[in-house]
Amino acid sequence: MRMHLHLTLVALGAAYVCANAVESTMNRLVAETLTLLSSHRTLLIGDGNLMIPTPQHTNHQLCIEEVFQGIDTLKNQTAQGDAVKKIFQNLSLIKEYIDLQKRKCGGERWRVKQFLDYLQVFLGVINTEWTMES
């Protein structure tokens, strides 16, 4: 029993370290992509005539699909040189990460009490982290 508990704790620790490593890698990837976007903005703008549907909503979490559709449009209309190739590679990796995270949304059935606990946390996030529009 003691050995089982020890192995469980080791496994949980390993999972925590792995999750932190992925988050840290993603943070670096996003930071690098922001730097690249800033550096190559003029190249991406081109002649300035490309029109890309852009969400008006300030809660970016709600507009992920639209943002990535815009990225695809930009990618298809931008000359593919080494400078922008890395940007679109990074954006593709970020999308893959988000898609993996979205798969966690389809959870198991919980009792009402557990669902209400989750709902309270969810509403707390909306209340504190989302910009409310009127």
Swiss-Prot record:
Pfam families: IL5
Glycosylation sites: N76, N90
Gene3D superfamilies xrefs: 1.20.1250.10
Subcellular compartments: Secreted
Endpoints of the signal sequence: 1-21
Gene Ontology BP terms: immune response; interleukin-5-mediated signaling pathway; positive regulation of DNA-templated transcription; positive regulation of immunoglobulin production; positive regulation of podosome assembly
GO MF terms, alphabetically ordered: cytokine activity; growth factor activity; interleukin-5 receptor binding
Any Gene Ontology CC annotation: extracellular space
Main subcellular location of this protein, as a coarse class: secreted
Similarity annotation: Belongs to the IL-5 family.
Function (record text): Homodimeric cytokine expressed predominantly by T-lymphocytes and NK cells that plays an important role in the survival, differentiation, and chemotaxis of eosinophils. Also acts on activated and resting B-cells to induce immunoglobulin production, growth, and differentiation. Mechanistically, exerts its biological effects through a receptor composed of IL5RA subunit and the cytokine receptor common subunit beta/CSF2RB.
Subunit structure: Homodimer; disulfide-linked. Interacts with IL5RA. Interacts with CSF2RB.
Protein name: Interleukin-5
